[in-house]
Regions:
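Terminal accessory/anchoring regions of large secretory-pathway or extracellular enzymes
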Residues: 1-194
Length: 194
């Protein structure tokens, strides 16, 4: 069972209550801690609140799908399609948009990736250089394969770390796909030269 919510990411598994999941939805307290009196007057949030959470039951072996659903719940919907199965899309260099029917083509995506239980957590420009940095996390209890397509704008992709240091350069396969093994619960950062 997975519980996804928006806002406060605080929970506890209550083993003495058959592994019930206790989720903090709103915290508005007059004082903090059980180690003395520490007043927090600005934490008194008077008023009406709208709280959102989602309960996602899933079968054994579907942990990755459950995590995808949980993360999707926390994101606002981004729409690029008009109507149910049609979109007007202006490709680079086109003056007039063309009508696309069916799904939007992958060649117009900025970065497409796949991986069971793997979620993108960051996509940003570097602090000290012009490279882009993308970070993924593997939520699974076993290793998984992250796959992503080499786009035309990518000159080089390399492993990095959180302080943006360059490590091993990756090589795509013959179809232009990068395949990277991620260990269980691994957080992996990649630099992209453009």
């Amino acid at each position: 069972l997975l519980v996804a919510n928006r806002g406060l990411y605080e929970y506890e598994i209550l083993e003495e209550q058959e592994n019930a999941i206790a989720v903090t939805l709103l915290r508005c307290v007059a004082e903090m801690g059980d180690w003395g009196y520490f007043p927090t007057p600005k934490a008194q949030q008077l008023g009406t609140f709208c709280l959102e959470f989602e309960v996602v039951p899933y079968a054994a072996g579907e942990t990755g799908t459950a995590f995808e659903e949980g993360y999707a719940f926390q994101q606002d919907l981004t729409v690029a399609q008009a109507g149910l199965e049609r979109a007007f899309l202006r490709k680079p260099g086109q003056v007039k948009p063309e009508l696309i029917e069916g799904k939007l083509p992958l060649e117009m995506s900025f970065l497409a990736f796949e991986g069971n239980g793997i979620h993108m957590t960051a996509f940003k420009k570097g602090q000290k250089k012009d490279d882009l940095f993308v970070r993924f996390v593997n939520h699974m209890e076993q290793g998984e394969i992250l796959s992503f397509k080499k786009e035309d704008w990518m000159k080089e992709v390399y492993r990095s770390n959180v302080i943006e240091e360059k490590d091993d350069v990756l090589t795509p396969d013959a179809d232009g796909i990068y395949h990277v093994s991620l260990r269980e619960f691994e957080i992996a950062t990649f630099g992209v030269v453009r």
